Amino acid sequence: MSDPASLFGLPPDPDAAPPVHLPGDWDEVLRGETSQPYFRELWAFVQREREAGPVYPAPEDLFSALRLTPYRDVKVLILGQDPYHGAGQAHGLSFSVRPGVRVPPSLQNIYKELRDDVGFKPPRHGSLVSWARQGVLLLNAVLTVREGEPNSHAGKGWESFTDAIIRAVNEKPTRVVFVLWGAYARKKAKLVTQPQHVIIESAHPSPLSVAKFLGTRPFSRINAALEAAGETPIDWQLPAEPEVA
């Protein structure tokens, strides 16, 4: 089996087809997307960025959301904007951070809402891997970022790729709950067109908008929507010790 560097490393020749093999069944679902001209340009851009300085997440974590949540298992999609831009934080899952990293403010606010909504007991870590393994696709709209510069990789092509992911999830015949927090994420609602799906929208859990986020009870609403469709609800309680991704 190829190692992560060969699967997710960047090609030396920008004109060469990117050697990208998406994890599991996503490779078939998104067949042809990584050979599109925009993706070749994006891949070359990320290569240049990695050569110039730190870019997060690490190459082996680039597609962690897809690796941990196969297409066939997706029941919930929680959309973030771009990865955390501090050293050691991002590991390819929206809102989640690596074990041992301080829980960021937005995730602290998510924990507060979980506590009030479903009786959640916050762990000391910020790893959401256990959600991903239950079918919660923790997807950022932009999959890479330059260290210390939020949104530095916006508008380079990732949005086209992740829009393709959202469209693919929209085509699932079983119910998926799309969770769109904040104005940026809410613009993606137009990609969700199939009537079996449910969209839950609210303000973002960022400290700048948390007053309008708290009290929206998204987690109990997600589970109610899943159960109404005969699907197993998500166990939102995170383990005391983080799962290894």
Curated annotation (Swiss-Prot):
Q: Which UniProt keywords apply?
A: Cytoplasm, DNA damage, DNA repair, Hydrolase
Gene3D superfamilies, sorted: Uracil-DNA glycosylase-like domain
Active site per the UniProt annotation? D82
Which EC number applies? 3.2.2.27
Q: Where in or outside the cell?
A: Cytoplasm
Reaction(s) catalysed by this chain's protein = Hydrolyzes single-stranded DNA or mismatched double-stranded DNA and polynucleotides, releasing free uracil
Q: What does this protein do?
A: Excises uracil residues from the DNA which can arise as a result of misincorporation of dUMP residues by DNA polymerase or due to deamination of cytosine.
Q: Which family does it belong to?
A: Belongs to the uracil-DNA glycosylase (UDG) superfamily. UNG family.
- Kindly provide the name given to this protein in its UniProt entry: Uracil-DNA glycosylase
Q: Which organism is it from?
A: Deinococcus geothermalis (strain DSM 11300 / CIP 105573 / AG-3a)
Instruction: Give the gene that encodes this protein.
Output: ung
